[in-house]
Amino acid sequence: MITDEEIRKVIAPLLLSGAKMLDKHCPKCGSPLFEKDGRVFCPVCEYREKQKKEMVKGVEERLMEKLTQLANSLPDDIDELEKHLRVMEKIIEVLEKYKKLEGRR
C-alpha cells in the first residue's frame, strides 16, 4: 500500500519531471509503474529500498563511531580491557551482519 508520504515525495515529483505513468502496477507494492528515459521502474519500491539503505548506513556509522571510541580509550586494567574487547568484538559481528544483509562483503 502506498502512503501519503510516498505520493508526496516520490510519485508527484516524478509526474512533474515528465515521467510517464503506465497502466501496469508493481507486483510487489501495487504502485503504478513509471517510465522515464526508456527505463520502466517502480518508484515506491526504489524509494523504500533507498530509505532502508540510509537507515542501515546510519546504524553502521554509529557502530563505527562507538568502535573507534572504544579503541581510543582502552583501559590499563586487564578485566576492564577484556570487557572493552568483548564489546568491540560484538560490534564487529553486528557490522558484518549488516554488510551481509546489504549483500556486500
Curated annotation (Swiss-Prot):
InterPro entries the UniProt entry points to: SSSCA1 (IPR009563), UPF0148 (IPR022954), UPF0148_domain (IPR051888), Zn_ribbon_RPB9 (IPR001529)
Pfam families: Auto_anti-p27 (PF06677)
UniProt superkingdom: Archaea
Transmembrane region(s): none
Listed GO biological process terms: DNA-templated transcription
Family: Belongs to the UPF0148 family.
Protein name: UPF0148 protein PH0795
Organism expressing this protein natively: Pyrococcus horikoshii (strain ATCC 700860 / DSM 12428 / JCM 9974 / NBRC 100139 / OT-3)
Source taxonomy: Archaea, Methanobacteriati, Methanobacteriota, Thermococci, Thermococcales
